Amino acid sequence: MSTTTAEMSTIDEQADSPLLTGPIFKQFCFLAIPTILGMVINGLYTFVDALFISQGIGAQAMGAVSAVFPIQMILIAISTMLGSGMASLVSRYLGAKRQKDADEVFSASFMLAILSALLLCTLTYLNLNSIFSLLAVPESLQAQASSYITPIVMFWVIGFICNQITEGFRASGNPKAMMQVLSTASILNILLDALFIFVFEWGVAGAAWATICALSIALVIAIQLQSKGESAVKFQRRSLLSPVQVHLKMLSLGLPVLLSHGGFSVILAATVYSISTVFAQNSEPLITAHGILVRCYMFLFLPIIGMMVALQTLAGFNYGAGEFERVKKAYLVACLISTVWGVIVTFILCLNAHWLIALFTSDALVTELGKEIALVAFAGFTTAGFCMMSSGLFQGMGKAIPATMLDAARTYVLLLPLMVTLPNLYGSDALWWSFPIADVAGGVFALSFSIFTLNRLIKKN
């Protein structure tokens, strides 16, 4: 197989990449800080969106959006799975100087993303009423819930495509381009939210249309950046119909992300269902309080996701180059920094939830219920970074099975069973204790398993 001059130039640049030679802490921060900033700016719209809905429309509208939020999250989870699986392969191929393979994977991911989006969104749209029944969405919230989720479902294919391009930037070691796209989408979303909700008075549908319009403009910007060479991988039309094995690799490597993000959606759905059935008398204010706390949690969790994304890229590059000691150092640095952030977030959510909720609503019942939930549910957040960093580590190394196992262990082996058993054994309020127990147990297991695996890898080589 011949190698072109352009490919040789790219290979030489990768061999001299500071990701393979520079100080681990510095390189981790180089990748993490822009990614975190981009995610925080991008995630700000989720926080502000909830704020505008609560203040501009009302607490009931916030409850309606919260009730169907699991649907939106599962769409995001599947999109993220495809992008993360592609990025894991691309970063390892670039680290191993396999430019042609990296280009092929990047290009093939678009066909998989578009087909997945069309199929998933069509099925969801056709079965919305059944999904409402499955989630036990209160009848009083269903009309507004439908107004919000319908535009999201109809046009989320835009989000799938945009995500593939930005993940390509990230896998190339260019998080600044990724941040530019995500930041633009977030800022536009906030501005359009204000316009559609407060000026045009479109209600909860305005929040949904603001998201779709902002994503559309962000996609145009992402395409422009890609065409200008901001990514180390190039789109090749002939690779759209790549062998099935290429798509299967992406799916297998992205599966841990689906289990993690999808697990979050399942937990949200299970919580909404539990509130609607176990706490029937206070279901609406509880769903609203829980929805507000979830938005705050998601915003404060974004730095940990950014660290995981940075670790995945750094570990992928060094693993592909055979630098296993650097892989371990990167993992330990990521765990340390994420733990520090976890302590800060635990303090904010557990001890200061009342002022966070007060930003969204003046309803005394919603505020009191939110304080009671937060004090218990977020007590184990300090260890949350261990699971995420371990998942990012194994994804970067291309080891789908351990990454999948670690994500599944916390959510499906620990949390969901605890959510079912604890309320039956100790009463309805015990539901909230499921979260810190699963966080601590899952985090300790993930940390121990990851260090054991890395030590064995280093010893063998």
Locate the predicted segments by residue:
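Residue-level signal for short hydrophobic patches within transmembrane helices
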Residues: T21, F25-L44, V48, I71-I78, ...
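Helix-terminus/linker motif at the lipid-water interface of multi-pass membrane proteins
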Residues: L44-M62, F132-E139, L195-W202, G262-L293, ...
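Small-residue-rich hydrophobic transmembrane alpha-helices
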Residues: M62-T122, G159-M178, V272, H290-F347, ...
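Short runs within selected transmembrane alpha-helices of multi-pass transporters and secretion channels
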Residues: G83, I152-R170, M178-S186, A207-A222, ...
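Transmembrane helical elements of multi-pass membrane transporters/channels
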Residues: F30-D49, P151, A185, A214-A218, ...
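Short alpha-helical transmembrane segments in multi-pass integral membrane proteins
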Residues: M1-A32, V90-V157, L188, V199-L255, ...
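Small-residue hotspots at the loop-to-helix junctions and early N-terminal turns
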Residues: A59-P70, S146-I149, A208, E284-F299, ...
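Membrane-helix interface/capping residues of multi-pass secondary transporters
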Residues: A50, A59-M62, Q99, L128, ...
